Design a protein with these regions (language model features):
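ABC ATPase NBD Q-loop/coupling interface
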Residues: 16, 65-82
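The feature captures the beta-strand-to-loop junction immediately N-terminal to the Walker
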Residues: 41-43
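Helix-to-loop junction immediately C-terminal to a conserved catalytic motif
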Residues: 56
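Conserved ABC ATPase "signature" region
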Residues: 119-137
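Conserved ABC ATPase signature
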Residues: 142-146, 150
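Conserved catalytic motifs of ABC-family nucleotide-binding domains
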Residues: 163
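Catalytic Walker B motif of ABC-type/P-loop ATPase nucleotide-binding domains
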Residues: 167-170
Length: 191
């Protein structure tokens, strides 16, 4: 079986050529296969968030490659948007991803940018909301009025609604109580 995603000798250095130059990730390599759960563990400041921002092209490597289905995601920089639809990323802090006036509109943003409309769009939004435990009566609320755990669910639903092949989660259960963590992880496994 071929890996869906490959990280090959990834290095990321911030502020190259300045007195503030600092390597956040050095010579990292791993493969991700269909259906696989992969956890990346490390201390605060060890480069985990920097690493995952490379997986869908939010950051460009200083050296090394990210391959999606065997193809370097940066081989055609104009197509990086397509990579972001295939590799969905949920940030550690969901408020970085939320900006619409309602939960529904926030979840719908990605699918709309994929060209989905009408019933197809509504189905994507409602199914993603259901998967993460967002009730229909919450869809008309402002995402900014929600608790931290609920904001995290909205951010996750917004990414899941795009139906990415790879789902990358930065601290997915932070802010959730034990029952919420268990429920969310079960729903992600079913995804």
């Amino acid at each position: 079986m071929e890996p869906i995603l490959q990280v090959q000798h990834l290095t990321h250095t911030y502020s190259v050529g300045t007195p503030f130059q600092r390597s956040a990730v050095e010579d990292m390599s791993f493969d991700v296969y269909d259906g696989e759960f992969l956890g990346i563990i490390g201390h605060t400041g060890s480069g985990k968030s920097t690493l995952i921002q490379h997986l869908n092209g939010l950051l460009r490597p200083t050296s090394g490659q990210i391959l999606l289905h065997g193809k370097d995601i940066w081989a055609e920089p104009k197509k990086i948007r397509d990579v972001r639809f295939q590799v969905g990323l949920v940030f550690q802090y969901p408020e970085y991803q939320l900006f619409e006036e309602t939960v529904y509109k926030d979840i719908a943003f990605g699918p709309i940018n994929q060209g989905k409309t009408g019933e197809e769009l509504d189905r994507c939004v409602r199914e993603a909301a259901r998967l993460v435990g967002i009730r229909d009566d919450q869809l008309d609320k402002s995402p900014f009025e929600l608790s931290g755990g609920q904001k995290r669910r909205v951010a996750l639903a917004g990414v899941m609604a795009m139906d990415p092949q790879v789902l990358v989660l930065d601290e997915p259960t932070a802010g959730l109580d034990p029952a919420g963590r268990e429920n969310l992880m079960a729903n992600i496994r079913d995804y």
